[in-house]
Amino acid sequence: MGGVGLFYVGAVLIIDGLMLLGRISPRGATPLNFFVGGLQVVTPTVLILQSGGDAAVIFAASGLYLFGFTYLWVAINNVTDWDGEGLGWFSLFVAIAALGYSWHAFTAEADPAFGVIWLLWAVLWFMLFLLLGLGHDALGPAVGFVAVAEGVITAAVPAFLIVSGNWETGPLPAAVIAVIGFAAVVLAYPIGRRLAAPSVTNPPPAALAATTR
């Protein structure tokens, strides 16, 4: 994933995390999901069309669709009020695919930092599956906090370092990202509930009834 695209992935993860925390309305988060989702679909399509059949280029571009489709789906759900069950099950597909991309980063690319980043994305998208696909609504604040944290440590910061020419992969960056990222996952539930808006942690009776229908 190129540095420019990754930078805006960081932005949309932060915005969507704040949405899950109840700090931004779904409609307020929609435009950026359309922008970044469109970017993450158009960019790999152009790369593949210009690849001349280069397998490495095609493989690198293929993972972008996982995120592009996710953000476009979020945007469409937000403006149509469709339920998130389908997106939740797609998130399980993304989580499993991310494990494969992580393995490829560790082995074929000798890039442990992005190997860890892909692992953290797998965890986040699996949490989205639990939240949306299986309906574990109580996880909403936890998923929101992890999305914000990963937006910073797996996307925005690495992307800024990449585009500024200061990015270095290796065991040390991988270890730093892993420690911060997995600590965020472990602490997600209590911190998420502390950061969430009252309407998320203590929904009114009408909202509770809506989630159980």
Swiss-Prot record:
A cellular-component GO term for this protein: plasma membrane
Superkingdom of origin organism: Bacteria
Membrane topology: Multi-pass membrane protein
Keyword set includes Cell membrane: yes
InterPro entries reported for this sequence: AmiSUreI_transpt (IPR003211), AmiSUreI_transpt_sf (IPR038523)
Main location: membrane
CDD domains (UniProt xref): UreI_AmiS_like_2
Subcellular location: Cell membrane
Keyword Transferase included in the entry's annotation: no
Function: Possible transporter that might be responsible for the adsorption of amidase substrates or release of their hydrolysis products.
Protein name as it appears in the record: Putative amidate substrates transporter protein
